[in-house]
From Swiss-Prot:
Species of the source: Mus musculus (Mouse)
Keyword vocabulary terms for this entry: Coiled coil, DNA-directed RNA polymerase, Nucleus, Phosphoprotein, Transcription
Protein name: DNA-directed RNA polymerase II subunit GRINL1A
Pfam families: GCOM2 (PF15328)
One GO-annotated biological process of the protein: transcription elongation by RNA polymerase II
Chain positions found as Phosphoserine: 268
Stretches assigned to coiled coil: 15-39, 299-333
PTM remark: Dephosphorylated at Ser-268 by the PNUTS-PP1 complex, promoting RNA polymerase II transcription pause-release.
One GO MF term: RNA polymerase II complex binding
Length: 366
């Protein structure tokens, strides 16, 4: 038997039934986009025959899906009715089971009178406690669930109160036809019960919560608790918080509490030496850096004449210094050396000195 090489096998037929309608529409949109591209279709060997075939298959599958969905929509109310009936039958079965269990409890309680009295008391207490809670939470429950609970609760209580012998005789006679009639009647009156459950409460009438509290005077005796913010305000009024101090530069924390500004107003103004001492002490407190000692006297006040004389003297000294510096720079450029000039030399001087000595000796001899 001839077999194609690996990688050249024909593709397996696609199963369009497994894909959803959204996937089929997406594939159809892509294939139609390819068909609109004429340049791409011309380059294909089959001129887009396969693409057109897939488009036809996809359209047929989509139309078939739409027909099936339209038929299913016709039977949708019937299916909903069946579901409601199934739910009603299951609830009826549960009611029957509860009745049987209640019969067993009644039989056991008839054997033990002490236990029966205890059970009756406990049931009364639970019913009393469940009463106000049912009133408070009645508005939050859905109307449909409330209808079912209302319909089922009286039947359960009636069956519990009936003796076990009567219930055992009644259960076999309960036929399926009666259950179906009850289910159909409950389904027909479902909408009516929903409307009947809706109530509009007037503002003039007291609310259910108020009636529940009136039935229980113990709850009214309790004092209403104060809100938390009222407690905080009362506590703050008793113990006021002092206002925070404003931040000031170069002020120690010890001085902030003493309020130095008020103390200085009451005292007499201190002398200059005392102020200097305080300033030095303040600098020593806030920093370890200290000023260097002064080499000159502090600034003094001078008259206008003295200041003019000092300025002229300073200007003259400055000009002389500038002249010396200019002459020194000029001599360095011209390579001139300033030395003592003596054209006669040392001998002339010596001769004069000797001659002077001889003249002095001759004068002495005379």
């Amino acid at each position: 038997m001839f077999s194609l090489p690996r990688g050249f096998e024909p593709p397996a037929p696609e199963d369009l039934g497994r894909q959803s309608s959204a996937e089929l529409r997406e594939r159809l949109r892509r294939q139609e986009r390819l068909l609109r591209n004429e340049k791409f279709i011309c380059k294909l060997p089959d001129k887009g025959k396969k693409i057109s075939d897939t488009v036809a298959k996809l359209k047929a599958a989509i139309s078939e899906r739409e027909e099936v969905r339209g038929r299913s929509e016709l039977f949708h109310p019937v299916s909903v009715d069946c579901k409601l009936r199934q739910k009603a039958t299951t609830r009826a079965d549960t009611d029957v089971d509860k009745a049987q269990s209640s019969d067993l409890m009644l039989d056991t309680s008839s054997l033990d009178p002490d236990c029966s009295s205890i059970d009756i008391k406990s049931s009364k207490s639970t019913s009393e406690t469940q009463g106000p809670t049912h009133l408070t939470h009645r508005g939050n429950e859905e109307t449909l669930e409330a209808g079912y609970t209302v319909n089922s609760s009286p039947a359960a209580h009636i069956r519990a109160r009936a003796p076990s012998s009567e219930v055992k005789e009644h259960l076999p006679q309960h036929s399926v036809s009666s259950q179906e009639e009850e289910i159909s009647s409950s389904i027909d009156s479902l909408f009516i019960t929903k409307l009947q459950k809706i109530t509009i409460a007037d503002q003039s009438e007291p609310s259910e919560e108020n009636t529940s509290t009136e039935n229980f005077p113990e709850l009214q005796s309790e004092t209403p608790k104060k809100p938390h913010y009222m407690k905080v305000l009362e506590m703050r009024a008793r113990n006021p918080v002092p206002p925070p101090h404003k931040f000031k530069t170069n002020v120690l924390p010890t001085q902030q509490s003493d309020s130095p500004s008020h103390c200085q107003r009451g005292q007499s103004p201190a002398s200059s030496e005392e102020q200097r001492r305080r300033a030095r002490q303040h600098l020593d407190d806030i920093t370890a850096a200290r000023l260097l000692p002064l080499h000159h006297l502090p600034a003094q006040l001078l008259s206008i004449e003295e200041s003019l004389a000092l300025q002229r003297e300073q200007k003259q000294n400055y000009e002389e210094m500038q002249a010396k510096l200019a002459a020194q720079k000029l001599a360095e450029r011209l390579n001139i050396k300033m030395q003592s000039y003596n054209p006669e030399g040392e001998s002339s001087g010596r001769y004069r000195e000797v001659r002077d000595e001889a003249d002095a000796q001759s004068s002495d001899e005379c």
